Amino acid sequence: VSILTVAMSIHVAIRHTTHYTFDRRVSLSPHVVRLRPAPHSRTPILAYTLKITPETHFINWQQDPFGNYLARLVFPEATREFSVDVEVIADMTVINPFDYFIEESAFHWPFDYDAALKRELAPYLETEPAGERLAAWLAEVPRERVHSNDFLVALNQRLQRDIAYTVRMEPGIQACEETLQKALGSCRDTAWLLVQILRHLGLAARFVSGYLVQLTADEKSLDGPSGPEADFTDLHAWAEVYLPGAGWIGLDPTSGLFAGEGHIPLACTPQPSSAAPIDGMTDPCEV
């Protein structure tokens, strides 16, 4: 990540390269790339470029059923390499994550969505059966009437305390029971667990894949965490919950914080499998 200060605002340049080299020439199936900031990103995106290797390819920009940008790639010739090179320039002006209004009907939790909205949110309300550990976790959630913001802050922070973070290279998402049993998970594991928790509590929620940009502070904190020692960017996952009047609000259970300017969503979907950064197949080969 490169940093550029422009007239008291901070612009960051993110470069993200995924590169595969094969041991033989292979045919590539059509690929889908979900590495363009989503239309609803609260962080202003100033520029975006996508470069694909091999150069002989066809690209068709689309939006999926959930409004996310995706690039569908078709490769007419066999190749020994495949790369996706993304560059994003974003304006990192500080965002107040609580800068929204909530409809009076949803001002306090618990609340119900009206019938028409509930139909529209149906894919984001589907739950997986709650196992023993998830049921026990949900049973400890207070049901007293409380401001919806306060409820979500407490829920997100509780999950952050309960699940330790780990880098997990295996593909896929852990089952909620496994994440709770281990008290350990990657960002995508904890994000999916939070999605299921919110849905079991009657709140529409979706899985988010995106970039997390963390910048060093100008001065070290005197009474709290000082943040990262160096500017840092990585692929990350978090959750979004739907609040009437406010729309989709990001919650990051890895940090226990609401999503801010450093959270740049790429794909927001009912299921994690629909948010994979790159989808596609090749002929049998070694990579």
Question: What is each PLM-predicted segment?
Answer:
Residues 2-4, 153-154:
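Acidic, mature catalytic/reactive cores of soluble proteins
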Residues 3-139, 145:
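Linear, non-domain "peripheral" regions
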Residues 9-13, 42-51, 166-168, 199, ...:
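A broad, low-specificity signal for short, low-complexity segments enriched in glycine/proline
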Residues 21-33, 171-180, 236:
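Short N-terminal helix-initiation segments at or just after the protein's N-terminus
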Residues 22, 96, 107, 161, ...:
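Glycine-rich, flexible loop/turn motifs
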Residues 107-185, 193, 200, 272:
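Secondary-structure boundary elements
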Residues 122-130, 277-287:
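A short, charged
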Residues 157, 189-285:
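Hydrophobic/aromatic-rich core segments of domains that either
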